[in-house]
Amino acid sequence: MKEYKVFRSISFQEEIAKYDKNIQDRVDKIEDKLIYNSEYGNPLGTKWFRESRFENYRIYYLIYEDLGAIYMVAISGKKDQQKTINTIRLFLEFFREEIEKLIREDNLQDEES
């Protein structure tokens, strides 16, 4: 199975930092699973937009097969689920540009190492 590189958006990382350590650890475990299983979680209308649920939370991520990357972009509770999904869909082009930039920066760091 293809191995993916998982990235977190700045807004996602800032939001996760507000949660207690238990929630942060669960997010880390989901991230670890995504490296080897891009189909982890539930599809949200397409195979490249998915969510993973635990307790009352949903983690949203975008899969970029052509880039070999997964981008974790949001967390929400059940009651904000549809609003969050709609917002992510509005910003798909922005997320694509952001992940491409992160990958370029990551590749530069790898070359310097």
Predicted regions and their residues:
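Negatively charged, low-complexity tracts enriched in Asp/Glu with abundant Ser/Thr
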Residues: 2-45
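Enriched for short, Lys/Arg-rich terminal
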Residues: 2-5, 62-113
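Conserved short-loop catalytic and cofactor-binding motifs
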Residues: 15, 49, 76
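Short coil/turn residues that cap or connect secondary-structure elements
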Residues: 19, 53-56, 80
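A short, surface-exposed loop/turn module that caps and links secondary-structure elements
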Residues: 28-54, 99-108
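Short, well-ordered turn and helix-capping elements at secondary-structure junctions
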Residues: 38, 56-58, 76
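ATP/adenylate-binding site constellation spanning eukaryotic-like Ser/Thr protein kinases
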Residues: 46, 57, 66
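Short, surface-exposed charged micro-motifs
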Residues: 51, 58-62
